[in-house]
């Protein structure tokens, strides 16, 4: 209580703060003085100011008892300013010591999750919810919760619906972050559920965009939409991070595009699908009060950024057969339908299987996969003798991904069971089942992937770079991945390909 009274009176002594456990004391004094003098606090009602004065002493005590007192204090001060006009939150924190301790622990241990709460104070509802540790987070639960929340909206105003989608996405992603941080979900499970959340969000946004387009231009004749969203990369591989963007490709049924829409301002089919894809990208990336849903990358479509945003599935298939590079077939390994017309998803799966199961020259595949890995590493790897890039480094996540892509391209023609999978753990298991990896190699890759992914997700939650100090265990893990890749004919660490010194 004395510290907060001193802050209110502009009489803080750094030595007193340091003695209380906030070091360096001068930095802590600046944080508290800034909070006490902030415009947000000056604008508080008398009742709100009283609530804050009651809350601050126990809040300071919770910060002092946390794993990182100064960091926790700094973030809590920003949160108090963010919710100063919503004093009900201050009252709830004052009344619930357990929630206060949970908040302080979170703010001390996860810069990323703390920033989410500061940016979207509605997430305090999740922190304050005593059931938070027991709330279901399975894939089906995620989709169902989003569906019910949208169904409860009184009106279908696009902006209001988007705000609700954003709130639910933020809440569910936050809960997933808590589950990973608390050990209730391991890294692969957290990544799968983050991907499931993204799928549900893309599906909701697609429905929103389709209703908006139909209101303006009508619908195309026929069952279903004839439009599909394909997830590539981490989304397609069900390995999404807490701050990942979405790699999306859009396809449509070319036969449906021959007709025009039935509205007052009809569009021909191709332009209708083009508008639909544009609206999906817009709604996913537009900045709202709660931020944007996701960053979106559509450059994996045929002809990349020079190509049309949306193509017919027939044109997509022709491109993959006749003009795609090997690296584009590698990308297809992790591609799958995530939203839109189920019949088109099935047709896409048939196209994907046809392309990936083509017989290939083994030496050419190995050379091209290794060459592309070398190019990516030269452009993107930030490793050196002391630091490892968890994604791009030698023996790190991308080496595992490229190895599995190469193995699938080599073996899918004779082992079509490989084509059922896009996620790394499932691909590792499938490669072992068909003999592309032996049991020991598969176990080592599975363990390495889980370890590296956990480290990468932890870096995100800590708001740290995914370029981390090397240690003996990490170097041994990466060396094992490199040795397995080399044994399979993919020498990703040969001279000129390794990490920079």
Segment roles from a protein language model:
Residues 1-498:
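A nucleotide- and high-energy phosphate-metabolite-utilizing enzyme signature
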